[in-house]
Amino acid sequence: MTLQETGCRENYPVAIVIVANLVSFLIYGIGACILYSFGLIWVVGYILFILLLEFRVMGWHCVDCYYYGKTCAFGKGQVSRIFFSRGRPERFNQKTMNWKDIVPDFLVFIIPILAGILLLIQEFTWPIFSLVIVLFLLGFLGNALVRGHLACRCCKQREIGCPAAQLFDTKKTT
């Protein structure tokens, strides 16, 4: 079966990379805006946490991925090549993933949402309320749409074997 027959992409179009990263950067930006209400040190900590997560993904996952050195839906295959040496592709689909593994990724938007709720309890303002709602929608729906319709559905690594795809597979039988 060829990539075209499976619907898999060898390299993703730049438009998909832009949309996928736009969702992430909006989450990061809105999260930083909310946390700024608590002080600049919270924003710095938040940004360092995000950078740590990004380097963790690129250093531990992207290096073994089919898209290492290629344009994946998030562009990280190209970026990881700059910072890290090629890993072992056969190792990628041998990895396992559970819900604990993705908690840090959820914390990127849940911490600012909780901080925003705390601000709203202290004093309700429409701007903070709006940011919390938008962040909630981007964090859950935005990520689900990007991964479900733009990224994972057309991913060659998913076809080869991906622990995240296995975790989120709603058709699996137990």
Predicted regions and their residues:
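Short, amphipathic, aromatic/basic-enriched membrane-interface segments that mark the entry/exit
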Residues: T6-I18, C33-I34, N98-V103, E123-F124
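Cys/His-coordinated zinc-binding microdomains
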Residues: Y66-G69, K76, K156-E159, P163-Q166
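Core segments of transmembrane alpha-helices
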Residues: N21-Y28, K95-I117
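Alpha-helical transmembrane segments and their immediate juxtamembrane interface regions
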Residues: I121-A164
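Short membrane-interface loop/juxtamembrane segments of multi-pass integral membrane proteins
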Residues: F74-K100
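Hydrophobic alpha-helical membrane-embedded segments
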Residues: S37-K70, L138-R147
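Cytosolic-side membrane-entry/anchor segment at the start of a transmembrane helix
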Residues: M1-Y28, T174
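Short, hydrophobic transmembrane alpha-helix segments
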Residues: Y28-L40
